[in-house]
Amino acid sequence: AIAAAIPARHVVGCVVHVSWALQAPGAVQHHFGNKLILGEPSGQQTERAKALAALLKRAGFEAPLSEQIQRDTWYKLWGNMTVNPVSALTGATTDLILDDPLVRDFISQVMREAKEIGARIGIPIDQQPEDRHAVTRKLGAFKTSMLQDVEAGKPVELDALVTVVQELGVLTAVPTPFTDALLGLARLQARVKGLY
């Protein structure tokens, strides 16, 4: 419905590096972060992207322009596609997820699958899962957005975070047994709770 209403030529990509929580209707609590990475799908530094970045900077955001917004999007997804559903399944904050060696190894396997998919679609990631875990570790003990949604009884964004990667695995002929297991477990939990 959105794609029909807004043609792709009117879209500027944005990767959000901010943590908020909805406390009540109209009341949002800011936890950390202030970065909104902007970029045209073409990678060009257009006037509209520059104007949008300037507007966001005046509003107090860090708003860098990216020449590779697809890579920035994939990199964020690469971390979120694991810790979000695992936190939703377990109720654990990110520090507890990374502290458990079996869980950390499992999510690393999922990330290796996604890394291979990224390479096949032209969005290589030059890091290893442990490098990304170090980034997540710096954020401290926090509840992911998916865990917050489960606790609030809201639908989970499983398709945007995990299903899409599993589908890309099929399209690129990358085996995804770990991603499949994560998707199956998270989807079943969400269905049982009426959140998917």
Where is each model-derived feature located?
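Rossmann-like NAD(P)(H) cofactor-binding subdomain of soluble oxidoreductases
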Residues: 1-27
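Generic beta-strand structural signal
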Residues: 9-16, 34-36, 59-61
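FAD/FMN-dependent oxidoreductases across multiple families
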Residues: 46-84, 130-131
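Glycine-rich beta-alpha junction loops
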Residues: 15-20, 42, 69-73, 81-83, ...
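Short, hinge-like loop/turn segments at secondary-structure boundaries
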Residues: 28-32, 81-83, 195-196
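Short beta-strand and adjoining strand-loop segment in the mid-core
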Residues: 26-53
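Active-site-proximal catalytic alpha-helix in oxidoreductases
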Residues: 70-98, 102-115, 141
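NAD(P)-dependent Rossmann-like dehydrogenase/reductase catalytic/cofactor-binding core
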Residues: 47, 96, 108-196
